[in-house]
Amino acid sequence: MAEVSSKELYKFKKTLKELSEKKGRGTELVSVYIPHDKQISDVGKQMRDELGQSANIKSKQTRKNVQSAIEVIMQRIRLFKAAPENGLVLFVGMIPRGGPGTEKMETYVFEPPEPITTYWYQCNNEFFLEPLEYMIEERETYGLAVIDRKEATIATLRGKKVNILNHLTSGVPGKHKAGGQSQRRFDRVIDLAAHEFKKRIGEHMNEDFLALEELEGVIIGGPGFTKEEFVKGDYLNYEIKDKIIATVDTSYTGEFGIREVIDKSADILNDLDVMQEKKVVQKFLHELVKDKGLASYGEREVRTNLIMGAVDTLLLSEDLTAMRKVFKCPSCGNEEEITVKSQSEADKLEKPCSNCGEILKEESSQTLIEDFVEKAEEMNSEVELISTETEEGMQLLRAFGGVAAILRYHVG
């Protein structure tokens, strides 16, 4: 996705998760996507048309709620002369808090992290989030090839987008029925032609894949043994060969074969993300057991090292639920930062000011993850958000409180 900060990405993912949990009673949640080049005046006209169309909705309550949502959208878009560079997204609708009659109008308006290319208007019982969810998908580039003796297809996979780079045909002759020396001679011709074809495939793969800045891995498929011969042979540049992560059997070649490779590699590609998480946690654990190792853990210790500029990579569990709050003294203005497990804990907190003894009042709040990510960006520290899908991820959360760091230098 476009270059955004770790904090912005975390907040965007958090917003999407919250929006995905919003459900309406009927098809009354309105989603609007406005590309940058779409005239706001045109959107306003379309909203007026939709307002008129909504009069045909049979359910009185749904009709009223949809019309209210459209009116809110019309009010909001009047505040814009033009859509921002990446476009504008609006989610508006009545969200129930409990039983009937508890609905409240909720409005979300923001610029997404990547450009919107298509105008959308949709009413449903949930917000339409697919275009935004696509933006946050991991979209590393993978090289793909399907090979047999007759043809080869070379492609890349980035997110859900497949790009066919090359399709080659071999001209390798089929089986020959002659016997004796003629048969042996013909077999040698076939083997030489097959070898030359594999050389040609390798040259094209080297040219196509070495030009890619971020090639995460290469997967090679095909219906016969040619793919194994190709992988074992000396046909690829060592940089490409070292990135082969799997070979898979397919029934087809060509574009159908590429699609089959993708389908059969879904688990492999998913495991690569998990392996990256495991790798960074294992690096932390390795530093932890060394004398004067470059490891730190626990909220207080990591925070201190982060502020000092000693943290190279910050490891945070995605399952951290704690909050970081700023409390302010109403008398002397003294501010103190406190970490709490939940909002209910903060509500019960009666902490006296360290200066004058007056009870502190909550001033601002954010999640502990947001707080740490913000500080990491200020100190140019890398941030790794670790899921609990692996044993290492669970260990980070349970044994180290979900907060750890790999240091730039040893802190005495």
UniProtKB/Swiss-Prot annotation:
Broad class of the protein's primary localization: cytoplasm
Pfam families for this protein: eRF1_1, eRF1_2, eRF1_3
Keyword Glycosyltransferase: no
GO cellular component term, pick one: cytoplasm
UniProt-listed InterPro entries: eFR1_2_sf (IPR042226), eRF1_1_Pelota (IPR005140), eRF1_1_sf (IPR024049), eRF1_2 (IPR005141), eRF1_3 (IPR005142), Peptide_chain-rel_aRF1 (IPR020918), Peptide_chain-rel_eRF1/aRF1 (IPR004403), Ribosomal_eL30-like_sf (IPR029064)
Keywords tagged on the record: Cytoplasm, Protein biosynthesis
Cellular compartment(s): Cytoplasm
SUPFAM superfamilies reported in the protein's UniProt record: L30e-like, N-terminal domain of eukaryotic peptide chain release factor subunit 1, ERF1, Translational machinery components
GO molecular function per UniProt: translation release factor activity, codon specific
Family: Belongs to the eukaryotic release factor 1 family.
Subunit: Heterodimer of two subunits, one of which binds GTP.
Protein function: Directs the termination of nascent peptide synthesis (translation) in response to the termination codons UAA, UAG and UGA.
Record protein name field: Peptide chain release factor subunit 1
Organism expressing this protein natively: Methanobrevibacter smithii (strain ATCC 35061 / DSM 861 / OCM 144 / PS)
